[in-house]
Structures are given as C-alpha cells and as structure tokens.
Amino acid sequence: MNKMDRQRIETVGKLGSTYGIRGWLRIYSSTENAESIFDYQPWFLKIKDQWQAIELETWKHHNHELIVKLKNINDRETAQTLANVEIGVDLSVFPALEEGDFYWHDLIGCQVVNLQGYAMGTVSEMMETGSNDVLVVRANAKDAFGKQERLIPFLYEQVVKRVDLTTKTIEVDWDAGF
C-alpha cells in the first residue's frame, strides 16, 4: 500500500464488518448511487491517519448489501483489521461539473453571507432531502439572532445567489432570523 497526500483525498465510503472467511468486507458507500463508488479508482484506505492505496479485486451484491474483496486480503483475520476504515479517492477522478453544480466537499467550510452582508456562519455539512440539498450552517459564536445552526436550502439562483470557491464564500437570499 502506497501512502497518499491527505489534501487530495475525498472520503467516498467506509468498509464495514467482515463477510465469510476469505477476506470479504461489507461496504458502505456515501456516493449518490451506492454502486458509483466502484467507478472511482484507485481507492485509498485511511489507516492510522494515513491514506494508503489499495487495489479492489472484485465486488458483488449480497442480501441488499455490497461486499468487496480487496487484493492481498485473503482471510477473515486480515480483513477484520480493515473494518470501519474510511475509503477515499483522489479528487482528480471526479468529473468536472456544469455551471451551478458543486461537489459537497467544495461547499463544506465555506462562509455563508446573506444579501444584506450578514455573516450567517460556516457550512459544516450538507444534508440530502427528497426535494433538494440543504446547507447546514454552523452560526458564528456571537450570532445576533442567537442561532447555533441554520438550515438553508441549496436552490441555486433562487436562494443561493453566488458561490465563490476561491474565497470560500456563498451568498444567499435568506433572512438571518431563520
């Protein structure tokens, strides 16, 4: 396993518990379509806070779950050492997006400001709902409205007016009192 610079790696899933005695592991994908995790190669595993390259040998469906066989992981005991380890891929494997589309990892950490110039906080995570994605904004410590968190729908052009990834700023048409 080769080590990789952590700055360029994005987590796309996690290995779960072992399956069987031949080194198979359950996998939990955080990609929009669970099987899409296999489109992004090579994989890196986060072991002891270091990203290390590993080769996927094969995968399959089993009882509504996905299971994987990693190269050179041939028994249950070795596989067990990888249980609950994060799976990452180099950001360069993600396709370029169209205007107005953004990867969640690019939005997390951005400062959110409304049209009146009020600093609403920092995007701490993204949430998927049935109709649209939602910015989870952790409010600044001395928020004038006493907010700790704001949920702002990510509706580009309607609510989200501008995203500047260079300055890590998102401008929204949203009342600071909400």
Swiss-Prot record:
A GO term (biological process) for this protein?
rRNA processing
Q: What is its main location?
A: cytoplasm
> Is the keyword rRNA processing in the record?
yes
**What keywords sit in the KW lines?**
Chaperone, Cytoplasm, Ribosome biogenesis, rRNA processing
SUPFAM superfamilies in the record:
PRC-barrel domain (SSF50346), Translation proteins (SSF50447)
- Which Gene Ontology terms cover its molecular function? ribosome binding
PRC barrel domain location, by residue? 99-178
Q: Does the keyword Cytoplasm apply?
A: yes
Provide a GO CC annotation, any one. cytoplasm
Q: Which Pfam families does this UniProt record tie to the protein?
A: PRC_RimM (PF24986), RimM (PF01782)
> Where is this chain's protein located in or outside the cell?
Cytoplasm
**Role this protein plays:** An accessory protein needed during the final step in the assembly of 30S ribosomal subunit, possibly for assembly of the head region. Essential for efficient processing of 16S rRNA. May be needed both before and after RbfA during the maturation of 16S rRNA. It has affinity for free ribosomal 30S subunits but not for 70S ribosomes.
Query: What is the similarity comment for this entry?
Result: Belongs to the RimM family.
Domain remark from Swiss-Prot or TrEMBL? The PRC barrel domain binds ribosomal protein uS19.
Instruction: Report the PANTHER family cross-referenced here.
Output: RIBOSOME MATURATION FACTOR RIMM
Self-association or partners: how does it assemble? Binds ribosomal protein uS19.
Q: Which HAMAP family match?
A: Ribosome_mat_RimM
Protein name listed in UniProt: Ribosome maturation factor RimM
Q: What taxonomic lineage is listed for the species of origin?
A: Bacteria, Pseudomonadati, Pseudomonadota, Gammaproteobacteria, Pasteurellales
